[in-house]
């Protein structure tokens, strides 16, 4: 896989992961915790695909292959980092929503 194609796949998978994470957040806000957790699983799968590409590139560079770092790859890495952070934060927010829902159920008994 050439560097430009790898960067495009990184952007695509990272972008999908980020979108799925925010879909999960919106579901959690509606009290649909189970559905939100399923979306997070999908987001993790897209993140694994992106991370696999990144790892492959890092290994190639460690083996001595040289890459010309361009704006596209910087952009791709930015997408990856943002998607990872978004998913981690959304997971924590989902946990908070789940706890709040449980407390509300206890109060309304």
Label each PLM-derived region with a short phrase.
Residues 1-109:
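Terminal alpha-helical segments
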């Amino acid at each position: 896989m050439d560097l430009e194609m790898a960067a495009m796949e990184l952007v695509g998978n990272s972008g999908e992961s980020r979108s799925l994470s925010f879909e999960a957040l919106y579901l959690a806000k509606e009290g649909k915790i189970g559905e939100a957790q399923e979306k997070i699983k999908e987001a993790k799968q897209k993140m694994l695909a992106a991370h696999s590409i990144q790892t492959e590139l890092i290994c190639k560079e460690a083996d001595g292959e040289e890459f010309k770092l361009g704006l596209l790859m910087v952009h791709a890495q930015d997408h990856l980092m943002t998607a990872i952070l978004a998913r981690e934060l959304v997971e924590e927010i989902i946990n908070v929503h789940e706890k709040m829902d449980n407390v509300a159920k206890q109060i309304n008994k």
